Amino acid sequence: MQRRVEYHRDAAFALRRMDRATSKRIRSKIGQLADDPSALANNVTALKGGAGLMRFRVGDWRVIYTDELVVLKIMKVAPRGSAYD
């Protein structure tokens, strides 16, 4: 069962502002994660002190999200250096 993907406004803004190829690559990985939670298993890490926040890498970009049973909420998409601010 594919989960519904919801984007926080900051994450949606970041995806719109980046170049098209990178945005497409990140959206593809998010889609894979929504389809199959174990698809990116070796690339997903729980954030310390993040109250259920998880992250995965796409090149030098980090996608921070919460994983609920039916909804995958994308909270932040940012370059590696500023993703954890």
For each feature predicted by the language model, list its residue ranges.
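A short, surface-exposed loop/turn module that caps and links secondary-structure elements
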Residues: 31-56
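Enriched for short, Lys/Arg-rich terminal
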Residues: 1-13, 17-24, 28, 54-62, ...
